[in-house]
Amino acid sequence: MAPKKAVAAPEGGNKENAAVKGSSKVKVKRKSIKLVKTQSHPPTLSMVVEVLKKNTERKGTSVQAIRTRILSAHPTVDPLRLKFLLRTALNKGLEKGILIRPLNSSATGATGRFKLAKPVKTTKAGKENVASENVDPNAEQETQKKAPKKEKKAKTEKEPKGEKTKAVAKKAKEDSDEKPKVAKSKKDKEAKEVDKANKEAKEVDKANKEAKEVDKAPAKKPKAKTEAAKAEGGGKAKKEPPKAKAKDVKAQKDSTDEGAPVKAGKKGKKVTN
């Protein structure tokens, strides 16, 4: 038998088959979700600090003791990774000042013994100093320059409002000027009165002096009389004999009185001459 001829497929059917084949070749892209492992333990440095707080020894704690205590407290930590994590944590603690080596320790790196550093008390003054150190001096200068400008603007704006105050100030100045004038006039009057009183006192003194001089002038005349009396002294000395005569007369009277009878007064009293 002769071979059968291939039957030509319809054109529409070929297109559908081609579309099915193309769809099978398309790859479906699935989103790859990455699973993030959440750490069930705190960071290594905080774990080291916890261990050192519990074990406060003077000589400090060794690295091996720290590692064993971390594993006992946090069993989820991978012991293989903990070696490398401890080294980095200890170095960071030394750099930040959280950890300290004991005295007389010659160890270096993440070996030897470690202790916790004493917490430094930050005072208010220290905080203020830190704040002042962080501030830029240039910024302060700019703020100081800007502040006077604002003040000048405020003054210029307030000048029209201050006209009343200026008028009041002028009146006060005028009053203050008048008061000194009044005071000066009073002082001048007092000075004039004092001068008048001084002049009057001087005039009175002059009058008193003149009166004294007048009193002294006639007093000199009696001196002349005394001189005349002295000159006449010789004449009086010559007239002494009449005085003796007067004495003789008195003696005679006394003798006559003794010889005369005594007169009797009233009531038997004797009357004496």
Curated annotation (Swiss-Prot):
Annotated segments matching region 3 X 10 AA tandem repeats: 189-217
GO cellular component: nucleosome; nucleus
GO terms (BP aspect): nucleosome assembly
UniProt main location, coarse: nucleus
Location within or outside the cell: Nucleus; Chromosome
InterPro entries: Histone_H1/H5_H15, WH-like_DNA-bd_sf, WH_DNA-bd_sf
Repeat (Sequence) residue spans along the chain: 189-198, 199-208, 209-217
Taxonomy, superkingdom: Eukaryota
Comp. bias regions, Basic residues: 264-273
Biased segments, Basic and acidic residues type: 154-256
Keywords: Chromosome, Developmental protein, DNA-binding, Nucleus, Repeat
GO molecular function: DNA binding
Region entry Disordered, spans: 1-24, 120-273
Chain ranges of the H15 domain: 40-118
Family: Belongs to the histone H1/H5 family.
Subunit structure: Interacts with nap1l1.
Name of the protein in question: Protein B4
Organism: Xenopus laevis (African clawed frog)
Organism classification: Eukaryota, Metazoa, Chordata, Craniata, Vertebrata
